[in-house]
Amino acid sequence: MLPTAHAECTGACDAQQRIATADAYLATRPGAVGYVLRDRKTGAVYRNSHAGDMVWTASTIKLGMVVDLFARQSAGLLRLTDNDIALMGKMLHTSDNDAADTLWSRYGGPDHTIFNNDFPHFGMTRVQPQRGFGDMFPYWGFQKSTTDDLDQMVNYMLTRLRPNETAWIVNAMQHVDPIQQWGVWGAGPNMAPGNKDGWSDEQGGWVTNTVGFAGPGQRFTLAVMNALNGAGGNADGQATTTRLSQILLADRQ
């Protein structure tokens, strides 16, 4: 008797099916969604057609601030205090705006440009501060960037910082307050996800963004920027980014 042939969808096949399902889902959702999915083990990367769109970053840029502060400390440009570390933790845990304001003023330089000047070093080559929205410029709260930039930044964090700094950030992102347990969090607890979310009602409508990782050793990274463009609200965007993350990441092998 000849053995029965059977096809099993694993690896690249599984990823392709997930991406097809994800793109079909996004076609039913309000607004424009850019995403970049990366498998750090195989090197496979998928970026959809909106990954290069310029979108308000909202609070995802706080992760970039944390990366920059650790990088500057490693370069001997500053020495972070216990208070600084506590504020960085608040930015990641509850997305604390006051903590971000303090650190932006404390380490942004007299003209507030140091963070923006540094962001390209971490792959955020298209980030642009936006004028006309407050007394301070540039200001962390009014910036636009791309999903590609967020992908580069989270991967810099995982590979280029000192191991103890990366471990500190990973732990913080895996233990966020319930206010941020959406987006990449949708990968599910067995995937040990971590994320930094950003949500805000901006000029042009709500944005709901998420950037993070999932899987053993943070194997997979996912960056998502959802510009609702007036077609939906915060709840819609959070639902979209969470379901997208579930489709792409849940139970990945």
Predicted regions and their residues:
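Secretory targeting and sorting signals
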Residues: 1-8
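Conserved catalytic neighborhood of penicillin-recognizing serine enzymes
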Residues: 73-125
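Active-site SXXK
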Residues: 43, 54-78, 91, 222
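Short, conserved catalytic-motif segment at the N-terminal edge
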Residues: 31-33, 37-54
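Mid-domain, small-residue-enriched loop/turn segments at the edges of structured enzyme/sensor domains
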Residues: 106-161
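Active-site-proximal beta-strand/loop segments in catalytic clefts of secreted hydrolases
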Residues: 38-40, 91-96, 103-107, 123-124, ...
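A conserved catalytic-loop motif detector
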Residues: 140-201
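Structured C-terminal helix/loop/strand segments within mature extracytoplasmic catalytic/sensor domains
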Residues: 9-23, 27-29, 53, 161-174, ...
